[in-house]
Amino acid sequence: MKSQAFFLLFLVVLLLATTQSEAFLGALLSKIFGKRSLRDVDTMK
């Protein structure tokens, strides 16, 4: 159980690190979705 808690803590730290660099996160999302913004994905629905 300790390893699971440590893994969750690592995910939280990683999430905080990604939110600190929104430019990097935006570039990563654009690579994944192939769209300029998430609004384009919403209009596809």
Curated annotation (Swiss-Prot):
The modification Phenylalanine amide is found at residue 33. This is Amphipathic peptide Hj0164. Expressed by the venom gland. Keywords: Amidation, Antibiotic, Antimicrobial, Cleavage on pair of basic residues, Cytolysis, Membrane, Secreted, Signal, Target cell membrane, Target membrane, Transmembrane. One of its GO terms (biological process) is defense response to bacterium. Its main location: secreted. It is found in: Secreted; Target cell membrane. It comes from the Eukaryota. Belongs to the non-disulfide-bridged peptide (NDBP) superfamily. Short antimicrobial peptide (group 4) family. One of its GO terms (cellular component) is extracellular region. It comes from Hottentotta judaicus (Black scorpion). Amphipathic peptide that shows antibacterial activities. Residues 1-23 form the signal peptide. Residues 37-45 form a propeptide.
